[in-house]
């Protein structure tokens, strides 16, 4: 239930998935999943939509009826949530980061803390606002893409607790001579730091390979780009300010 029976059903900090030890095999785990604004408008009137939660507090009966889970202050970290369009846009950013962190955090402890996990649930049989990757209208939200990225069979990832880049191999095949390139950019796209390492990966293993520095001369948000064998990169938005990405 939620992300596991040992804690409340609620959104978690990305770091939490790497540091909190839950059930070794969890067949029922999930998190937030608010859809995009088009689906929201199919559920509620504009008056009800204008009562969107602020800093995680549901202020409207209709939102409670549709089982709004709440995002805490995670949306406000990206700026002022001034209307329902902004609410849904920021929610997609958080949905992606939440589920990617979820998958990467658990996989980073595979065969040590965990043996497996199942997402519950991918969809709802009604117009609900929680625990879904596609909604009643069959519209996909960003939770699906975060899960898909975090579940890549051979995957470069970032651990926000150790501040290291690592390599996950959840396949049954050994790999050799792999290239991982880490790059840090500012918000204008200027390259601030770059490092490459080469590694091998045994089947069903995880390893941490690179220390990721905090870039000098940056205050606020910046990007970390991890590319494995020049494939589709894994991009993180990080910050020097506590939970402020504005």
Which functions belong to the PLM regions below?
Residues 2-7:
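Short, small-residue-biased leader/transition segments that mark boundaries at the very start
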Residues 8-9, 223:
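Long, low-complexity segments enriched in small/aliphatic residues
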Residues 9, 229-230:
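Intrinsically disordered, low-complexity regions enriched in Ser/Pro/Gly/Gln/His and often acidic
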Residues 9-13, 210-212:
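Glycine-rich, charged/polar anion/phosphate-binding loops
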Residues 11-176, 181, 192:
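Substrate-binding clefts and catalytic carboxylate motifs of secreted carbohydrate-active enzymes
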Residues 163-201, 206-211, 220-229:
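Beta-strand-rich binding/interaction modules
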Residues 214-216:
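Short, flexible loop/turn segments at beta-strand junctions in immunoglobulin-like
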Residues 231-246:
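Short beta-strand elements
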């Amino acid at each position: 239930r939620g992300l596991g029976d040992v804690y409340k059903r609620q959104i978690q900090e990305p770091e939490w998935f790497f540091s909190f030890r839950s059930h070794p095999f969890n067949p029922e785990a999930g998190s937030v999943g608010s859809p995009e604004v088009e689906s929201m408008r199919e559920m509620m009137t504009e008056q009800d939509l204008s009562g969107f939660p602020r800093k995680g507090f549901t202020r409207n009966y209709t939102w409670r009826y549709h089982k709004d889970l709440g995002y805490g202050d995670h949306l406000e970290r990206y700026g002022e949530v001034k209307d329902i369009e902004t609410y849904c846009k920021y929610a997609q950013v958080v949905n992606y980061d939440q589920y990617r962190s979820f998958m990467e955090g658990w996989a980073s402890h595979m065969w040590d803390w965990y043996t497996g996990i199942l997402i519950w649930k991918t969809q709802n049989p009604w117009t609900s606002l929680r625990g879904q990757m596609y909604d009643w209208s069959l519209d996909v939200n960003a939770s699906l893409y975060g899960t898909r990225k975090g579940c890549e069979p051979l995957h470069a990832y970032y651990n926000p607790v150790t501040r290291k880049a690592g390599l996950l191999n959840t396949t049954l095949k050994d790999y050799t001579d792999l290239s991982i390139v880490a790059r840090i950019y500012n918000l204008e796209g200027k390259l601030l730091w770059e490092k490459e390492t080469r590694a091998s990966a045994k089947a069903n293993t995880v390893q941490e390979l690179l220390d990721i520095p905090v870039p000098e001369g940056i205050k606020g948000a910046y990007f970390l780009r991890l590319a494995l064998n020049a494939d589709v990169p894994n991009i993180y938005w990080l910050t020097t300010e506590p939970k402020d990405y504005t």
